[in-house]
Design a protein with these regions (language model features):
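C-terminal edge-of-domain segments
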Residues: 112-130
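Glycine- and Gly-Pro-enriched alpha-helical subdomains that act as flexible
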Residues: 20-62, 73
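Short, conserved loop-to-beta-strand elements that form functional interface hotspots
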Residues: 67-72, 76, 82-112
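Short alpha-helix carrying the canonical HExxH Zn2+-binding catalytic motif
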Residues: 12-17
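Generic secondary-structure signature for well-ordered alpha-helical cores
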Residues: 21-25, 53-61, 82, 89-94, ...
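Glycine-rich anion/phosphate-binding loops
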Residues: 10, 42-47, 80-81
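A short glycine/serine-rich beta->alpha loop
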Residues: 6-7, 35-40, 108-112
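Single conserved hydrophobic/aromatic residue that forms the stacking wall/gate
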Residues: 1-9
Length: 130
């Protein structure tokens, strides 16, 4: 992935972590992995995703599926989505077919439309393993 696409992907991974933790009623990514703690400062977001999956597994859950949306004018992400899905699947130990990643824009509206930033959202289904 390009540097810009990697930054966007990082935001998406954080959104997925937050959604997984929220679905398991385990607070959020900042609670478990504060960037003020030296061990988490500049950590690879894929490691956080793996640790998040381990945390929810410890509470008796597994990932069912992921529906993620990235909202950005740039970079254009369509060509990168299959690699993003495959990488996430490997990290989480699930099938890439259980991960939907969509890229959209705000049609030039708001801070994302002005290219001042991006946003990422995720909805997840987790299932009890017991």
């Amino acid at each position: 992935l390009s540097s810009a696409a990697s930054d966007v992907y990082k935001r998406q991974l954080h959104a997925v972590c937050d959604a997984l933790l929220g679905a398991a009623n385990m607070r959020d990514i900042g609670y478990h992995f504060p960037d003020t703690a030296g061990e988490f400062k500049n950590i690879d977001s894929k490691i956080l995703l793996k640790k998040t999956v381990e945390l929810i597994a410890g509470k008796g859950y597994k990932v069912g599926n992921i529906d993620a949306t990235i909202c950005a004018e740039r970079p254009k992400l369509k060509a990168h989505i299959p690699l993003m899905q495959e990488t996430m699947a490997i990290v989480m130990g699930i099938d890439a077919d259980d991960i939907s990643i969509k890229a959209t824009t705000t049609e030039k509206l708001g801070f994302t439309g002005r290219e001042e930033g991006i946003s990422a959202y995720a909805t997840v289904l987790i299932e009890k393993t017991d």
